[in-house]
Amino acid sequence: MGVPIGDLVPRKEIDLENLYGKKIAIDALNAIYQFLSTIRQRDGTPLMDSKGRITSHLSGLFYRTINLMEAGIKPAYVFDGKPPEFKRKELEKRREAREEAELKWKEALAKGNLEEARKYAQRATKVNEMLIEDAKKLLQLMGIPIIQAPSEGEAQAAYMASKGDVYASASQDYDSLLFGAPRLIRNLTITGKRKMPGKDVYVEIKPELVVLDEVLKELKITREKLIELAILVGTDYNPGGVKGIGPKKALEIVRYSRDPLAKFQRQSDVDLYAIKEFFLNPPVTNEYSLSWKEPDEEGILKFLCDEHNFSEERVKNGIERLKKAIKAGRQSTLESWFVKKKP
């Protein structure tokens, strides 16, 4: 879900071409959830193979990753590890919301209301370990780097970006900024036309670039104050934040208070200072490799077509596109190296 500070954050629309040659660390769980939510049939049922196993996420990962590679982007997917203990309440809340949405989905189906059914089906989306392992396997077969975070994937992606190993972190959530990512790319995996909920209207969704330094300059605060602001309005670790405090009021509080959390700690059932410390110093690892390899053609065909009933013709076409994108990327890198070497 992430922290609700979007109204305060300056951001600008960009084209995929603006990210040409850039390495991007993508929040894998966030992307998988998006694919599972959006790649569905009219009644909200996800794509499945002949054995009833969900494949929406595999379709999304395969074709969207190829699109990114064709745009000259080098994607790496960062997977979540163990969540912090104080996230348990939010995870339980999400589970209950999914169960309620699933009941409403079935009710809408029984009434023949397909639009309502699809809406609730999206809200009922859940990601289990099997879906994650399938996603990892596909990405490895495609030659795409995967990184296993010790805890939050967004924290690991932000760390990689802060080191300069990648250009930016990619996620729909703004938490990456709290974790210190110098740049955040939103809408990277959902770019294109999307239907507005409840309306027969389609809108064009484009990637957005959010630069941490520009955010802090616009709000006239430090990153530490941005974290305090987020805690006041609510994060995944203290859902809902402080009652009655929205983003604008929280901004005013953190600007003029040396220790804005002190006043509200007494009325909170979680340690607000522990949450702040987690954002400042989350568990991360240096054990990762950013190496893009040739795809395993036979492995991809076996996994997607033989095991999950994907169209062999479409998958073969996708593999060819992927190979061309990798070759073009290497050629571009070689040419830029020679340009730099010229006297």
From Swiss-Prot:
Start and end residues of each stretch annotated as Interaction with PCNA: 330-338
EC id: 3.1.-.-
Keyword tRNA processing found: no
Name of the protein in question: Flap endonuclease 1
Role: Structure-specific nuclease with 5'-flap endonuclease and 5'-3' exonuclease activities involved in DNA replication and repair. During DNA replication, cleaves the 5'-overhanging flap structure that is generated by displacement synthesis when DNA polymerase encounters the 5'-end of a downstream Okazaki fragment. Binds the unpaired 3'-DNA end and kinks the DNA to facilitate 5' cleavage specificity. Cleaves one nucleotide into the double-stranded DNA from the junction in flap DNA, leaving a nick for ligation. Also involved in the base excision repair (BER) pathway.
Assembly, per entry: Interacts with PCNA. PCNA stimulates the nuclease activity without altering cleavage specificity.
Cofactor note: Binds 2 magnesium ions per subunit. They probably participate in the reaction catalyzed by the enzyme. May bind an additional third magnesium ion after substrate binding.
Disulfide bonds: none
HAMAP family assigned: Fen
Gene symbol of the encoding locus: fen
Region called N-domain, residue ranges: 1-98
Membership in a protein family: Belongs to the XPG/RAD2 endonuclease family. FEN1 subfamily.
Annotated GO MF terms: 5'-3' exonuclease activity; 5'-flap endonuclease activity; DNA binding; magnesium ion binding
Keywords from the UniProt entry: DNA damage, DNA repair, DNA replication, Endonuclease, Exonuclease, Hydrolase, Magnesium, Metal-binding, Nuclease
Gene Ontology biological-process annotations: DNA repair; DNA replication, removal of RNA primer
One matching Pfam family: XPG_N
Natural source organism: Pyrococcus horikoshii (strain ATCC 700860 / DSM 12428 / JCM 9974 / NBRC 100139 / OT-3)
Sequence positions that bind Mg(2+) 1: 27, 80, 152, 154
